[in-house]
A protein has these predicted regions:
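Radical SAM enzyme core and accessory elements
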Residues: 3-5, 12-22, 81-87, 157, ...
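Glycine-rich beta-alpha loop elements in corrinoid/cobalamin-binding modules
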Residues: 47, 54, 61-196, 200-203, ...
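Radical SAM [4Fe-4S] cluster-binding motif and immediate context
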Residues: 43, 205-413, 418-420, 429-433
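A structural motif corresponding to the C-terminal end of an alpha-helix
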Residues: 51-63, 313-314, 403-411, 438-446
Length: 690
């Protein structure tokens, strides 16, 4: 049995006569060789490496083809597939955005090998019904992939003919989705989970071997580790490292600990790597799709061995933990910190819940080489946090940011999500003001557009997606679901791709782009005035943190435009001038915050926003036809308000959990018919993740 595991890239496709081609098929895009410059670095196919390790532990041998990072054209795919001649292919789609390429690759495989088994895994299998019916896929794996994939191989060994399925045998394997003998979707529940003791770290040598054999070079393995000198944060990182080292040296004088001095210049020549210390997430955010259930941590001994390997083999001096939910296990978090210090590497951690740590924890982590921590906050409005089911308060976030600032830990509240059901002008103002308060606390300037905000996108397998279907915003037929996935793949997180789930008009929602920034900057200015009794201090801070920062931001935006003009604008001077004038006018309106009251400036901003929206609508809206699945989509007037998140519905909720979008979706579901058929029950498993 020849087994091939492939990482599948996200990205849209251009449809041509006779075949599906990747976007930009005329260009060679390769994350390793950088034949087209990219600000991104390759991401190791961790899921694929995990599955192949478990396969080998159970007596199977397989090959890896890193399609995600190599980005081959169809001709290269065909050449490699013919070289390997697989009998079983596993396609790993970690995002719903991978759907077009899942379809493309499966089609090529079926054309080449009519009898090949095609198995799809990853978060994308929340759309299993669509994948099984609209692509050449035979089976989907729902949940953790290791155990069910090996059981599929066991099944194929006994039943090699893919056209003659033993439905009874397949039904005994947990974690599968397939089309049964009655042409109905069958989901056998979520898969068995590997126990924590069996979690393994990726074998980069296996990936290196794959790159050497299939479309790349073995030395490209080093591209997974970014040189720190290329990081925009290198100076800040070195400053924190110096602080940590000085503290350790002072402690050494008292406790006689053996402390190794850190050479800052040496650190600049190190590389940054990634490591997982846990698997899964304890949270249930209503916008987030999580196919992996439960929460497990890696063994401390295995972590230490892996960290030392990365340090010695790949010159890694700075590690980023890539956990979905770091520090949820307090005991394990302390073990991780001790290992990092023992191994002599500095580290950062993102995806931390603000309620998972306190001041003493942060202090301990800082003493054990933690440089940076990222908290996911999503909104500065308590109403929106409750709808997202974040289960913390914005005061919790503020307190953690304050403690990090006091301890000298670089921290970044992760990107804001705007436009969820229940979002209003008031909640957007709250978010802008909250971002301003955190930036003021951290002695930063007033650019509250950082961290960047993204518009909420409904991903299959989330309450947000089901809510959109309940309200007629996303269709329920296979063709409509496929059209939606193709659309969000093309536009991703842009405003144009956003489906308005709020009570406000599209024009009003577009204005929120500006409202968040302007309300935040007004709040920032007010904080300066309230915190400084001296007029001189007020003027100095307003100049340094507002006016000067705005000028620098304008210059930086111009620099970016001119660097990209040959690629994006193709020398069209008029278009460049229009964009420059637009940037200049927005910056001038920002400066107006320093001199004009809200009652005067905000109506001007709204009028400007409405004018911008008019031209955007005129440019993008399809004439003599209907736009679907974007901001211009005509909403279904036949859907009653009983399914929608309205302010009155939120106000009537007595408990936080009643404001959760999950609760609202469950109530909506009960108002319709309960699942009757086995297929409807299977679809509900995928929709609810249970």
């Amino acid at each position: 049995m020849k087994i091939l595991l492939c990482s599948v890239p996200d990205g849209s496709l251009k449809v041509t006569v006779g075949s599906l081609l990747p976007r930009g098929a005329g260009f060679k895009f390769n994350f390793y060789s950088r034949e087209i410059p990219s600000p991104l670095i390759p991401t190791a196919p961790i899921g694929v490496l995990r599955v192949i390790s478990w396969m080998e532990k159970n007596g199977y041998h397989g090959e890896i083809y890193d399609i995600n990072n190599l980005r081959p054209k169809d001709e290269e795919l065909i050449k490699t597939f013919k070289q390997i001649k697989p009998t079983v292919v596993g396609l790993s789609g970690i995002l719903s955005y991978c759907y077009p390429n899942i379809k493309r690759i499966a089609k090529l495989l079926r054309q080449l090998f009519p009898n090949v088994w095609i198995v799809v895994g990853g978060h994308i299998t929340a759309s299993s019904n669509l994948i099984l019916r609209k692509t050449e896929t035979d089976i989907c794996v729902v949940g953790d992939g290791e155990i069910p994939f090996v059981k599929i191989l066991d099944y194929i060994k006994l039943h090699p003919a893919r056209r003659q399925l033993d439905y009874t045998a397949l039904s005994q394997i947990k974690g599968l989705a397939f089309i049964d003998e009655n042409n109905n979707l069958k989901v056998t529940g979520y898969s068995e989970q590997l126990p924590a003791s069996e979690l393994q770290y990726p074998d980069y040598d296996k990936l290196k071997e794959s790159l050497q054999k299939y479309g790349g070079k073995g030395e490209w393995i080093h591209e997974f580790f970014e040189p720190l000198k290329n990081s925009s944060d290198i100076d800040d990182l070195c400053s924190v490292i110096k602080d940590i080292t000085n503290k350790q040296m002072k402690d050494a004088e008292t406790h006689q600990d053996k402390i190794c001095e850190t050479n800052i210049d040496s650190f600049r020549n190190k590389k940054m790597g990634e490591v997982h210390t846990s698997r899964g997430c304890v949270a249930r955010c209503t916008f987030c799709q999580r196919g992996v259930k439960g929460y497990r941590t890696y063994a401390a001994n295995d972590l230490e061995t892996h960290v030392l390997e990365l340090k010695e083999k790949y010159n890694v001096g700075y590690l980023q933990t890539q956990d979905e939910n770091a520090f949820s296990n307090k005991k394990q978090a302390y073990e991780v910190a001790r290992i990092m210090k023992k191994c002599g590497v500095f580290w950062k951690s993102g995806g931390v819940r603000c309620t998972s740590v306190n001041y003493e924890d942060l202090k301990f982590f800082k003493e054990h080489n933690l440089i940076f921590i990222g908290f996911g906050i999503e909104s500065g409005s308590q109403q929106m946090l409750d709808i997202m089911e974040k289960k913390f308060t914005k005061e919790d976030v503020y307190n953690r940011i304050s403690e990090c600032h006091e301890l000298g830990i670089i921290n970044n509240p992760s990107g804001i999500i705007v436009g969820m059901p229940g979002e209003t002008e008031h909640t957007m103002k709250e978010t802008g003001e909250f971002l301003a308060s955190m930036r003021y606390l951290k002695d930063q300037d007033w650019n509250v557009n950082l961290p960047l905000s993204s518009w909420a996108v409904a991903i299959p397998g989330t309450p947000l997606y089901e809510y959109c279907q309940q309200n007629g915003l996303i269709g329920k037929t296979l063709d409509e679901q496929e059209e939606y996935l193709l659309r969000i793949t093309d536009e991703k997180l842009s405003f144009l791709n956003y489906i308005n789930t709020t009570e406000s008009s599209n024009e009003e929602v577009y204005y929120w782009n500006y409202l968040l920034h302007f309300s935040g900057k007004y709040a920032f200015k007010d904080l300066i005035i309230k915190s400084n009794k001296s007029v001189r201090n007020r003027m100095q801070q307003i100049y340094e943190r507002c006016a000067k920062a705005e000028f620098n931001a304008f210059i930086n935006s111009l620099s970016s435009l001119f660097r990209l003009r040959s690629t994006i604008y193709k020398g069209k001077l008029l278009k460049i001038l229009i964009i420059i004038m637009n940037h200049l006018f927005v910056r001038l309106m920002h400066m107006g915050i320093l001199f004009l009251p809200k009652a005067v400036l905000l109506p001007i901003v709204r009028a400007y926003s409405n004018l911008r929206f008019y031209f955007i609508k005129k440019k993008y809206k399809v004439k003599n036809g209907k736009q679907k699945y974007n901001i211009f989509m005509e909403q279904n007037a036949d859907i009653g308000r009983k399914f929608k998140v309205t302010q009155s519905r939120i106000d009537q909720a007595n408990r936080k959990i009643e404001r959760s979008l999950r609760t609202i979706v469950n109530v909506n579901r009960k108002q319709t018919k309960s699942p009757i058929t086995n297929e409807e029950k299977s679809l509900e498993i995928l929709a609810t993740g249970q």
